[in-house]
Amino acid sequence: MVDNRLSPHGGKLVERVLDPKEAPGRIAGLKTVPVKGQTVRECVSLAYGFFSPLEGFMGRADVDAVVNKMQLASGYVWSVPLVFDMPKQQIDELEIRTGDSILLTFREKPLVILEIEEIFTYDKELMAGKIFGTTETKHPGVRRTYGYADHFLGGRVTLVSEPIIREPFKRFWKPPAVLRKELAAKGWERAVAHQTRNVPHTGHEWLMKGAWFASQATGVLVNPVVGEKRAGDYIDEAIILGQDVLREAGYFREDVHAVSLLFWDMRYAGPREAVFHAIVRKNLGCTHHMFGRDHAGVGDYYGTYDAHKIFDTIPDVGIYPVLTKEWYYCPVCAGITYEGLCGHQKSKQKFSGSVIRSIIQDGVKPPRLIFRPEVFDVVMSAAEEYGFGSPFVTERYLAEAQPVLTMPDVKK
């Protein structure tokens, strides 16, 4: 039996980016629709194959299959809908019809050509309930779903130009085709992926090291999500630079650790998002994906290890899930230890994100055992250079920080 764990999901890596010479002619005369940042990130990720085998936004058959059966209409496992919404009033005003092509723009620059294969409606309450396991608007994914307009446009997207990625993200922007070549050049036959939206404390570090041991991996690919931010989150610059410095400071050897970014806005869909993450990292060339406690969860909507259990209920997606428990500080062991090994359960001290954040907010360097000093220094440096003095997202950051990606003008 042939192991397909180095193959993209669906067997073929999607890449839909126009040749610069073609762009002017392809977009001439198209109706234009401006879009927000979330759609931009999804379009770029679709066009470069992060979401293979998808070539664009889902039609009704795919949405229905994903919502009810956690698979695409073709039968491939898929867990989170990817849709493009538009109000019917706007559709009517622009006289958009099935079979049309329209130009989506960002900040008045051409983004993608959307070939409209279907215009449809869908029950948003049904979608939210199936995907998130709740219809409560306190859940951020439910709120996002209810915020969709009343119609959806399904169809393939083609990126008009290569995006411009600003610093410090530029060196971490590696589309699947590029990253796969880099991992092959490193000799990483077994690569384990780490999903994160945080600056790393030592619990995260040992989560990665434990998964490396458990999977007998050649290397660890840290793949932070860069997307929508809320006040109080770490700024993206601090996250990606903080992750990268673990290798630069020697906590991982140069040949067993790498960092690349993923444009994606978290849905906080718990176990369903865990499956989505596994598929995306499979497309990046990873053979394994680590899943710890409360993966992609929010509040108390999901069980601690629901993201582990879901892999027992679905067909093999072509990437090995590495299921780990919690790493924490044990004062009796006098170090970082693992829930599956340590017998001092009553003494364990969990890594409190809120406590660490409050210490950092005061400019105090946390104890080395829970936060590497090099990480702290990078985080504070990022705060000064990119965060207007704060390593956390503020209203000023939301209003004034430049987008991570923009689109160039198309030369005629």
Where are these regions (language model features)?
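Active-site cores that bind ATP or allylic diphosphates and position pyrophosphate for catalysis
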Residues: 1-412
